[in-house]
């Protein structure tokens, strides 16, 4: 029914969304799980590539060990990378397994302070890097990684800012990379490795 509504005969990429816990992975990849259905759809020509998204490094690594996914959608973010060492191991495993690396949350900064207004970014459950210089450095950090693509934020103003930054993209210099690392110091990341 979805293929008919979209007037196509296949999906280029179909992803398991939001693998957060090992239980999520077990259910999706186990007998009669969603992954089994995705594989059958791929064999039938309805799906070309199978991917997944995760917000847990441990689950992402386990998923790539368990199945030969074509892509991963994962939060590659300068604060998480430097303050929580969250992301380098996932990027390395994805490169090793030749999995396309799609980044999200590149312009995320930290959790919202308690009782803080989320205005004007009501769609963001995290505090974004809304100041233009910081946003530019944050997105350029992610785009400077060995990724396939970065998904812009869904918040309209941030989306437009991301497009402007990407249009004039220059990889971060070694000095700028060091500066971004300093900008992350002491900032609470939105994701951490499991204890």
Give short role names for the model-derived ranges.
Residues 19-195:
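Beta/alpha (TIM)-barrel catalytic core signal, keyed to glycine-rich beta->alpha loops juxtaposed to Asp/Glu
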Residues 1-3, 37:
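Short, well-ordered amphipathic alpha-helical segments that serve as non-catalytic structural scaffolds
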């Amino acid at each position: 029914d979805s293929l008919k509504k979209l007037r196509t005969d296949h999906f280029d990429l179909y992803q398991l969304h939001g693998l957060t816990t090992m239980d999520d992975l077990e259910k999706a990849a186990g007998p009669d799980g969603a992954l089994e259905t995705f594989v059958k759809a791929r064999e039938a020509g309805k799906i070309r590539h199978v991917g997944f998204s995760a917000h847990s490094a441990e689950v992402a690594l386990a998923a790539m060990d368990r199945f030969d996914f074509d892509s991963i959608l994962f939060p590659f973010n300068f604060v998480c990378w430097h303050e929580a060492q969250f992301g380098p191991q996932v990027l390395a495993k994805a490169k090793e397994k030749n999995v396309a690396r799609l980044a999200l949350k590149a312009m995320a900064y930290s959790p919202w302070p308690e009782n803080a207004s989320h205005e004007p970014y009501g769609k963001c459950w995290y505090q974004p890097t809304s100041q233009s210089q910081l946003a530019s450095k944050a997105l350029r950090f992610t785009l400077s990684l060995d990724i396939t693509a970065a998904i812009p934020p869904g918040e309209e103003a941030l989306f437009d800012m991301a497009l402007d930054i990407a249009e004039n993209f220059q990889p971060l210099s070694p000095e700028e990379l060091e500066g971004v690392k300093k900008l992350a110091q002491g900032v609470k990341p939105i994701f951490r490795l499991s204890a």
